[in-house]
């Protein structure tokens, strides 16, 4: 059975607390120290940048799975939520919520009366 996770697509833009964010997906993402990272949240630039690969050596890169890429997006998105609430960047909160969100999208089920409804996006169904 196809899940919400299977249907989920990372957006190019979204708005949180009145601030529009741009989402950039790149092969490799590096932080301010030039270290490779899974993703970055920049409240000053209102951007989230997500990596698709992680350098192992100078000539070898690990390809992230969809699970890793989507989890990284949610992790950085939850940084934007937390920043809007209290101007902090708590890693443990962002990662916990990202894990919960991915689990939710993978396990959400619908009663049989809603099965078979077609939608291009999982959240725009009419009831």
Task: Spell out what each predicted region is.
Residues 71-83:
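Active-site recognition of the HExxH zinc-binding catalytic motif
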Residues 1-67, 84-127:
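Metalloprotease/metallohydrolase-associated module, dominated by Zn2+-dependent proteases
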């Amino acid at each position: 059975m196809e899940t919400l996770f299977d249907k989920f697509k990372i957006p190019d833009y979204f708005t949180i607390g009145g601030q529009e964010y741009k989402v950039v997906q790149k092969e490799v993402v590096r932080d301010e120290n030039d270290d490779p990272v899974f993703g970055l949240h920049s409240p000053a630039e209102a951007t989230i940048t997500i990596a698709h690969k992680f350098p192992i050596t100078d000539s070898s890169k690990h390809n992230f799975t969809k699970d890793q890429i989507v989890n990284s997006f949610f992790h950085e998105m939850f940084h934007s939520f937390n920043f809007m609430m209290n101007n902090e960047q708590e890693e443990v909160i962002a990662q916990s919520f990202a894990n919960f969100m991915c689990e939710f999208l993978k396990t959400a089920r619908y009663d049989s009366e809603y099965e078979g409804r077609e939608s291009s996006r999982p959240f725009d169904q009419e009831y």
